[in-house]
């Protein structure tokens, strides 16, 4: 009986995947790239890029939603895998 209970507990923990946290790149133009651990409920990594004053600007990080706004030449990319916003 104890073996069955232990097996059920192990399977429950494995199925819930407790403690998983998404990681996303969070730098601007630094090299090497740095990462951040996103909050538990965050599903997206994002990358915003645009031209300002003739220089390309880049912003990366974690996001709760995937913004679909592209205005004034701003490009927004979202993804759901770890470190996919390179």
From Swiss-Prot:
Gene3D superfamilies: CD59. The keyword Secreted applies. One of its GO terms (molecular function) is toxin activity. It is found in: Secreted. It comes from the Eukaryota. Expressed by the venom gland. Pfam families: Toxin_cobra-type. Its main location: secreted. One of its GO terms (cellular component) is extracellular region. Disulfide bonds join 24-45, 38-62, 66-78, 79-84. InterPro entries: Snake_3FTx, Snake_toxin-like_sf, Snake_toxin_con_site, Toxin_cobra-type. Keywords: Disulfide bond, Secreted, Signal, Toxin. The keyword Signal applies. PROSITE patterns: SNAKE_TOXIN. Residues 1-21 form the signal peptide. Belongs to the three-finger toxin family. Short-chain subfamily. Orphan group IX sub-subfamily. This is Neurotoxin-like protein pMD18-NTL3. It comes from Bungarus multicinctus. The lineage of its organism: Eukaryota, Metazoa, Chordata, Craniata, Vertebrata.
């Amino acid at each position: 009986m104890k073996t069955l209970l232990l097996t059920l507990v192990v399977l429950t923990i494995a199925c819930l995947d407790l403690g998983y946290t998404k990681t996303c790149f969070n730098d601007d133009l630094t090299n090497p790239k740095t990462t951040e651990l996103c909050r538990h409920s965050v599903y997206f990594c994002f990358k915003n890029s645009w031209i300002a004053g003739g220089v390309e600007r880049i912003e990366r990080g974690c996001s709760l939603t995937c913004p679909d706004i592209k205005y004034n030449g701003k490009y927004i990319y979202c993804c759901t895998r770890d470190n996919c916003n390179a």
